[in-house]
């Protein structure tokens, strides 16, 4: 059962399907890939919500990192939850404590339940508005059901463009 199922009381998805190939998640926003523990938020940095990485964000658009379904777009628009067609749950959380901005600086380009292809724009981000509100602009990429999946490896490092492979899964 993944994080969103636990949070919203949904039922667990049937077994995650892997076709024997290494699964890959693409970087959803331009920036510098950093280890999860370097994020300026203890909840993300300690991997309580799942394994992943951080991104010192430089881009202003969040793209779908894989083919899948948008599972969550909070009213505050600061994050997007997704489920890949292969069963990978990913939380893309832009900025730290940006829920406090109540949507200012964010424009949603999608909605919950939307089926999207990798590279589909999901969210526009105003990094200056985040900074002006006194929040770090780092983005957390969290595989919220990482305990239910094969071993995850962060394969991107340093400056990277959206669309660069960032996570791979091994059997």
Feature-to-residue mapping (PLM):
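Contiguous, well-folded functional domains in the mature portion of proteins
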Residues: 2-171
